[in-house]
Design a protein with these regions (language model features):
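Short, basic/aromatic recognition patches
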Residues: 1-15
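Charged, amphipathic alpha-helical segments
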Residues: 1-4, 49-55, 117
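A generic local secondary-structure boundary/capping motif
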Residues: 6-7, 57, 119-124
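Short beta-strand segments
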Residues: 11-49
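A generic structural signal for short beta-strands and their flanking turns/coil linkers
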Residues: 12-14, 42-43, 62-66, 77-84, ...
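Short acidic, glycine-rich loop/turn motifs
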Residues: 20-24, 70-74, 138
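A short mixed-secondary-structure module that forms the rim of ligand-binding clefts
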Residues: 34-75
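Charged, gly/pro-rich active-site loop segments
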Residues: 78-153
Length: 153
């Protein structure tokens, strides 16, 4: 479902947010530190900070639905990936460098548009993480312009 060019975009270090909802249809969400595309693009692992996971994980386990918004700050290219919850487990030490590497790439992107990391993100706790695995069900362009909302996969 996620081809190689899209995988490379998603894994480069972007501003990422995961949204879900509770049984009363109230939205819930969190920042995502990094993602990894797996299984030839059929699945995606979102690394979400442990500090913010309890309610999000509860909602994912209850309804199984998630939407991830990806945006590159320097040009506003954006993608939405919808998915179904497969599993969640603590991310391990081997994954830490990969995850924080993507986070560092986002900080570099933010610096290019004038948002210094020390002023905009210094209090965010981005590790340790929970690795949330999703089966990709739909992908949409969210880049502003005439193609916004178009199906990518």
């Amino acid at each position: 479902m996620l081809d190689q060019p899209l995988t490379e975009f998603l894994e480069r270090g972007l501003a990422i947010h995961m949204g879900t909802r509770n049984a009363a249809l109230r939205p819930n969400g969190c920042r995502v530190t990094a993602v990894r595309v797996e299984d030839q693009g059929r699945n995606l692992v979102a690394f979400i900070p442990k500090a913010v996971t309890p309610a999000v994980l509860e909602d994912l386990r209850a309804n199984g639905q998630a939407a991830l918004s990806f945006a590159r700050p320097t040009d506003d290219r954006a993608v939405q990936v919808k998915g179904e919850f497969i599993s969640a487990q603590d991310a391990d030490a081997v994954e830490e460098a990969f995850v924080l590497g993507q986070w560092q790439s986002l900080l570099e992107e933010l610096a290019l548009i004038g948002l210094a990391p020390l002023t905009s993100t210094s209090t965010w706790q981005m590790w340790p993480c929970v690795a949330v695995k999703l089966r990709v069900t739909a992908v949409f362009s969210q880049t502003p312009g005439p193609e916004a909302g178009s199906v990518l996969a």
